[in-house]
């Protein structure tokens, strides 16, 4: 059974990590390594007033998850946070672990491996936390080349709940159309070039499922092959929030842009 070690304070593991350990037929470890990055700031003086998410510090950490299901072998670092509002921290961490579990569960019936390619707590804002996980999928035995798989998590730090496209856009079709239009405007300036694959930006939830909330805008991460050939790598565009002003939920606009 896979073991799990955390540096710093102990953290209860969610069911997805327990499932990884339970089905593993190899020894493995999961290790969290706190970084030195601290965002936001705690109050300088004691107070008896209720503490808001904005006054609590969140520290970026990481967790190494290793093991095997028999069909899938994985050794992946996932982004995590510590500190702050425990409900927000728990929601973000569980969501990132669930994102990895989805990648382990959701790729056909053939044997494969998953390894780390990129992981980060991409943005910790006053009201929102965004996380990025990119793993490297490879056939087992290895095929022609690995394929990156993208996952993102966006959590409302005021309510400790994930923010979905349906939450962000009250009129979802209108929101998706705006994302499609803006992507068509922005993609020619990326490595995808003017001949980008247009089916990859059709106004569907699947095409815009991977996004991060940043102060600059809605950072959209396209999957491998989605808007161009494998050779160009993963492509991202950032749609400014003001370009989405007519379709975004007014109550969420200050949250995602914080």
Which role fits each region the language model picked out?
Residues 2-11, 23-152, 156-258:
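Compositionally biased intrinsically disordered regions enriched in Thr/Gly
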Residues 17-20:
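Bacterial Sec-type N-terminal signal peptides, specifically the leucine/valine-rich hydrophobic h-region
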